[in-house]
Amino acid sequence: GMMTDTGGFTYNSNRPEIFFIISQLLTKGINKDKIYRNVFNNYSLWRLRLMGYVMYTKLNVFAEYHAAYFTLTRRDLKHFHFMKGDAEGLVNMPLQIKGMKLSISLREDTEKPDTIWVSLRSVDDFPCNKMAEKYFNGGGHLNASGGHLNCTMDEAEMLVNKAIREFRW
């Protein structure tokens, strides 16, 4: 949890106590490399294919707003043999693009029609939690938030486009 909840120790919310606890665990002999491999290098082939598909085909970049979003439809999820957890972390990937401050993912619920799950990630002082509250019936932390919408994917995309263009903090 310490590794994933801190974004691999990259989030601004990291506190010195976490690093003290990690140093104590290392002193006790934990195998940090094995833990890392089990957490981050343990994906299925279908998850990797999904990641490539999303970044190549589904990613919409708004360079002038330092933002990006992508969609995952039920059809996409079925095609890539989606299993719970396969979408975890995908929303962080667009933040690797130079200059990006905000990334949003829209994922159709696999069972409930017209239910869209929204994940938001940001860097620096961009308050994605405020955007989640204002536009996506959600909330969360400064740089990691979520929400949901009861609408079609087309309607959700229109709302994301509006949010990216209008939101000011």
Stretches with model-predicted labels:
Residues G1-G7:
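His-Asp-centered metal-binding catalytic motifs of divalent-metal-dependent phosphohydrolases/nucleases
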Residues G7-Y135, G140-W169:
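Hydrophobic helix-and-loop "lid/oligomerization" segment in the mid-to-C-terminal part
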